[in-house]
C-alpha cells in the first residue's frame, strides 16, 4: 500500500530535544519548510536553520505564558485539511497544508516524580496544544505524518530519500498508531495522578499521595509475541513498561539462545528478584517460580555449587540467577553439570559466553547492575477485576528482630536466620526454608498447611544428605500451632525466624523453649500467592 505523500512543510515543537537539530537539518536540506514554536524555534534558529515561528505564521502571538501557542485554525486547518477535498476552503482562509508534525509532550511524568512537586507544578506541565496537534495529525494520517518518537527520525529520512521526499501510507499509519499510544499513555498518567488525590482538591498530604487512583490506567508496550502461553493451547505476548528504572527481566538483553518462553520469563523474574536481596556473591536457582536452591559465598562459582546441592533434581531445567558477572569458570560448571533453561546475571565475560554458546538452546540474559529496589505496584488478575498492591520491598534489619525464646541465637544461627528469611519471601506460601552456613538445605513450598511445608523441607534435606542439625528455619507467616516447631525440632533445627502474631504465639514459643530452639520474631509477613 504505497499512496505516498510528499513532505513539503513540517511543524516541529518538542519538549525532549534529543536529535531534533539533526532531524530538522535533514528536513531543511531536503527542501522542507520548517514551522516551530517557543524554545524549539529558538534552538533551530540558533543553529542557523530557516524557521518560521508559528506566531508569525498565524499572526497571533503566543500568550498566557505559553499556554496558547498552536491552538489556531491556521495550524489545525493545515494539519486536518484533507488533500483534494478541503483545498478550496484552505486557500480561501490562507491555510497552508502541514505535511508533517513533530511533537513530544511536556514532561508530566518526570515532573510529578520529583520530590516536592506541587499541584501547580503538575498542572503547568499538562500539555494542551501538543496532544491536540498529535491527535489531529494522527487522525489525518492519510495525508500527514505525525512523529512523536526521536527513535523514528533516521528511518523517516531514509524513507524520504528512497521515495523522492515522500512517505508511504503504511509508514504514516504506523506513525499514527504510535501517536495515539503516546497520547493515551500521557492522558493516563495525568488521570492516575489526579485520581489519586480524590476527594481532596489539594491532595498533597502523605495520606492522599498513598491512595490508589479511582480509575487505574495502565500502559505497556509489546516487547515480543510468545510461541504460546503457560500452556501450549494459550496464546501469549510479553508487554513491558516504558522507561523502567530498575534492572529487570523486562529490560534485560538476551545475548544468546533461543526465544524466551512465557514460563521462562516468569521464572527468570522470580530468580532475579530473589538474588537482588543479597549483597554478597549469590546464586538463586528457580523451578516453577519457586527457589529450589539459594546460596551466598565469596565467589559466584561456590555460591552456584552450594545452591545446586540443595536440590539437584529440581535444578534440572531450572533458571539460574547471579548478582555478579558470569565468569568462565562458573559457566563451565553449569554447562558440565546440568540442563539449564536460562542464566541471568548483571553481565557476562566473553569467555563465559563462548562456553555457554556450546549449548545453543541455553538462554543467557544480561540485565545490568542494580543499586536499589524501586517502589512500584504489583498486580494480580482475577476474573472481572485486578488486585493492586505495593511491591513487597519490606525488609528487616538485625536491630528490628525480637528474640522471644529463652535461648538467644548464636551469631551463626542469626546469620542463617536472616539468610533464609530473605529466601522465604520468594517461596510460594505456605513457605518454609531451612538454611545452614549461608545455603538453603531444604525448601517446602506452596503447601496448604504450614506443618507439611516444614516436613517437606526436612525430607528434601534428608534426600540430599544435607545436615539439618543446627540449622535455621524461616516461615513466611506465623505458625498457627506448635506442630511446625515440633516437626522442625525432630530433624534438628535449632533456630526459627517467623513473623509472629498468632493467637497461639505463647504455645509456639513454649514449644521452642521445650526443644531448646531460639525463636526470632520479625513482625513482618511475606505471603506470596
Curated annotation (Swiss-Prot):
Give the family this protein belongs to, as stated in its UniProt record: Belongs to the PurH family.
Xref: NCBIfam families: PRK00881.1, purH
**Has keyword Hydrolase?**
yes
What is the gene called? purH
Stored PANTHER family: BIFUNCTIONAL PURINE BIOSYNTHESIS PROTEIN ATIC, BIFUNCTIONAL PURINE BIOSYNTHESIS PROTEIN PURH
Q: Start and end of every MGS-like domain?
A: 1-148
Pathway field:
Purine metabolism; IMP biosynthesis via de novo pathway; 5-formamido-1-(5-phospho-D-ribosyl)imidazole-4-carboxamide from 5-amino-1-(5-phospho-D-ribosyl)imidazole-4-carboxamide (10-formyl THF route): step 1/1; Purine metabolism; IMP biosynthesis via de novo pathway; IMP from 5-formamido-1-(5-phospho-D-ribosyl)imidazole-4-carboxamide: step 1/1
EC numbers for this chain: 2.1.2.3, 3.5.4.10
| Provenance organism | Salmonella typhimurium (strain LT2 / SGSC1412 / ATCC 700720)
The name this protein carries in UniProt is: Bifunctional purine biosynthesis protein PurH
